[in-house]
Amino acid sequence: MGTERQRENKIRQWFSMWLDKQDTGIEELFTPDAVYIESWEPEYHGNGKIKLWFDEWSTRGTIERWDIRQYFHKGDQTVVEWAFRCVMADGTVQSFDGLSLIRWNEASQICFLQEFGCNENRYDPYAQGNTPVFREEQALWF
């Protein structure tokens, strides 16, 4: 199996862990000194902290969808485009599009992952003319 295919399989494994709420190898997937940056500011250092976050978050929410749209590979990096939807224990629903920028080490472990989010509820503020009309609702956190 080629390197790109192996990386894609590992990304699918990571997304499946969240969908199934089951750790099937976080400490093997991420390096001991991995850095994981969420799109809304939290940053985790080390595979142990990433596992702690995964275990704790899974008690507060359920990911309903994390669909992969496409991958881009260059050298030791992969970018994956995805669509995400989760429901928190309090009933709050979050749904957005995103990208993950991933760097791999020589052993095909993730050593860096940074997420970028984009509100899926987009609009054109200039649809009615040259003066922008913005929505009254609060935008998502990213």
Q: What spans do the regions from the language model cover?
A:
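Short, low-complexity N-terminal intrinsically disordered segments enriched in polar/charged residues
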Residues: M1-E28, V133-F142
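A solvent-exposed, acidic/Ser-Thr-rich amphipathic alpha-helical stretch
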Residues: R5, T24-E27, T31-G75
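A beta-strand edge to alpha-helix "cap/lid" segment located at domain peripheries
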Residues: G2-T3, D55-F142
